Every structure is written in C-alpha cells, then in structure tokens.
Amino acid sequence: MKKITRRSFLTVCGAVAAAAALSACGSSASSTTASSTAASSTAASSVAASAAGDLSGNVATGGSTSMKNVIAALTEGFAEVQPGVTVSYDPTGSGAGITGATDKTLDIGLSSRALKADETGVTGTTIALDGIAIIVNKDSKVEDLTVDQLKQMFTGEITNWSEVGGDDGEIVLVGREAGSGTRDGFESIVDVKDTCKYAQELTATGAVISAVEANPLAIGYASLSAVGDTVKAVTVEGVECSEDTVKDGTYKIQRPFVFVTNDSAPLSEQAQAFFDFATSTDAADLIRTAGAVPVNE
C-alpha cells in the first residue's frame, strides 16, 4: 500500500467536510460485539476478487459525523487496493446510520456509540475508540477538571468559572443536539443525561468547536479526532485525552466507533472487502492518522 501523505489525507477530508456540515451524530450506549455475523457471511466469496483488486461498484456508508476523518482515511487507503470501488459516505448521525443498516438502505452504518438492547437485527463491530475531549477557549486559565466538576457545571450547580479555577465569568455550556452519539456518550459517562443546562445545542462537531473558539466563557465536548489547535482540550482528573490514555482506559470520557451491518442481508463483495480492510491490521495506521485509536493492530 502506498504511504498516505498528510496532503492527500487532508484532500479527502475536505471532500467529506462539506457534507458533514448538515449532519448530526446519533443516539445512546450499550454493548458492541467484536465481530459482524452479517459481514462475515460473504467473506469467502470475495477473497479471490479482493486479492486481485478487480472489484467494482459502490459501498454505501452513512451515519456518525464524528467518524468523518476515519472514513476519509479508510476510503483513501482502500482505493489503493480496490481502485474500482467507490465508497460513499452520508454524514447523517449515528441514529440514522443504525437505521440505514437496519432497513438495508446502507451497506454499512456508522455509529459513534454502542448499539442499544432494542436495536436488533443488526450487529455492531468496533473498529476504533475515540476520546471525547472537554474543550475550552484557548484564553481560559482552566487546565484540568474532574468528572464531578463537569457534572456540576453541566447541570447548573456550578455556574461561574471562578469556582473551578478560572476568571470570573458565567459558564456558557455548548453541546450537541438531542440524538447525537457524542452527546449521549458524554452525558452517560458524566452522569448528566437529560439534565444539562445547555446555552447552545448544535448539530455538528465542528459547530461546537467553532462556538467554543469564539467565546472565552464557553465549554463543550468534541471527538478527539476532530479537535485541533483552535481550542484547548483540558485534562480530566489529571489525564490528557490522547491515543494512549484512551487505549489504556485511563482517560474516562471515551466511546467506540462502530460499523453496523444487517444480520439478514449478506454484504456485497465490494462491501465485504471494505469491511475486511477496515477491520484489519492494515488499517491501523490510517485510523491513527485520522485521530482515532485502532483496536486491531
């Protein structure tokens, strides 16, 4: 496989970023399996074609907006071995991704949360882990927060930055919209589900980052893979949000990136080949380049 350069990776990311502006990230958490029954059902039939690199057609994916960079990197890497296959990505949110896999309008649904117990007929396969970074304005004096402080801040018990080591000023809470996988992950882990006193509820990860960048009194949360240098990610109980701390579990606010496949509908050869590529050790560096933590390496 050719080396994926920063220039080529950013080119692909730019292509999907425009679509992601209209998106949302899906719903709540439960359990995710280590393998996909539906995805594996056609693996044997696609091996020869996949190895030869002569597959063609489209693989329809969609769902989580937080997985944008990961899907962009995987798509570019897969094109190196299967140039005849097109992988489409519709950033509609995790809930829509799961629904798409369930009703077979998508080959592979994308979710930034584990499947819930009542989401049946589909299987979730974790391809990566993602830390949910707690972000503040770059001018904020606050460097570290505890989970308990976050709970009190987002429920309105703590309302002034001076109470957590910052300058005097009313805390502005910025979050995602109801149904977002990022929101569900944050609220479940911090134990603030449905009790947050948001000043703004935004429909995309990038919008949250932009809002925090623009307001010195704001605090929000965003996927580690999406956080750049326009905002500051604080440590949580002294632990930085990074690949190492997410992987070893010391960073507490994290969630899975999941491929969702239909249990009753075998994947097409090209979709199976993409699934196998994305869950192989060959994809680990691509996933890491995209800012997430690979689980297969």
Give the ranges of each region predicted by the language model.
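Exported/periplasmic ABC-transporter solute-binding proteins
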Residues: 2-4, 26-30, 34-297
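N-terminal export leaders
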Residues: 6-10
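Hydrophobic helical h-region of N-terminal Sec-dependent signal peptides
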Residues: 14-18
